[in-house]
Amino acid sequence: MTTSQRLDLIASVADFFEPYTGHFDRESLQRAWDTEVSAPSVQIPNYLVHILSGNTPHAAYQSLLNGLILGAKNRIKLPSHALLDFQLPPIMADFMEISRHLPEDWLSEADALVVFGSDQTLRHFRERCPLETPFIGHGHRYGIAWIQDPSAEAAQLAARDIGLFDQNGCLSLQTIYLEQPRAFGPLLAKALEAFEAEHPRAKLDRSSSGAISTLREEMRFLAANDPENYELWESQGSTAWTIIFQNSHHPTLSPGNRTVYLRPTPSDFSALQNLSGIALHPYEPRFDLPSPRIFPLGEAQFPPALWAHDGVLPLASLVSHQTISPKINASSGKS
């Protein structure tokens, strides 16, 4: 199958992928190919191994789309007890192998390896990956928002970014920065309550629910003893959503499941690390912020197809290049 035929085939099943990858068409597939991997020196991987986490299916389909464009044989390691409804168009079957365990030969035969998971998972597979094999790791990251117009509309957009997928995955907002963060609390509480009514959060196991309850108790204690620096808003009778005002710029990893921090805007965002993206409201393109993705508030979970996940080009990162040097004739010396 030629590259053109393969891109035609992928474009024919775009409707299947687009809920997870964002919109693409035949033209955008060709443009990505021409931009990233059309050079004669490019060597396409024969076997591309994807080690997937169970947070959301989006990263899985986005990674697979990259491999399909390249024409690699995609070996997909699914989580043992997650992504149970993961499926693919039958016409793409020749490009894929799927397993919930990791066959021994997959790593040794991999021409490129893509891993999603914890930082510990990334270290584990990086140590097992030969140095010459392209390795792309997507580990712990989180999203933030910078809201300069704290309106009811902004609260609704933020609730969408917090609530979709229950903060599973690296794109979800965990911290919102504002000039007056405490004043935004009631607006966001109303918006999250409305979002919960329309999109109920998934049922939690005892451990996850307990983590939220423990954090709430800690925040109640702090708010009672230091009300200038702490305040808590919470869903009544459940752990459906939790909002914490903390008078500190430094982000804290939340337990997820619609738990978010409101913090004062720092004078410099450069100290923040491991960001997946920054949502802005109002939106304007900003190239001075320390994040691989800048986007309008409300669109955290919907990056464009073939985006540079974690700042890494999706196709170019998976290929290698071979340099063929011309023969240099030694010039004869003069007597």
Which sequence ranges carry the predicted segments?
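Short His-Asn-centered micro-motif
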Residues: I51-G54, K77-S80, V115-S118, H138-G139, ...
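N-terminal Rossmann-like NAD(P)+-binding subdomain of aldehyde/semialdehyde dehydrogenases
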Residues: M1-V49, H58, T265-D268, L275-R286, ...
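Donor nucleotide-activated moiety binding/catalytic core segment of transferases
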Residues: A32-N55, S99-L107, T239-G256
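Short, well-ordered alpha-helical microsegments
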Residues: A60, T121-R123, G185, R286
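NAD(P)-dependent aldehyde/semialdehyde dehydrogenase
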Residues: F165-L178, R182-I328
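Conserved small-residue-rich beta-alpha loop and adjacent elements
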Residues: A32-F95
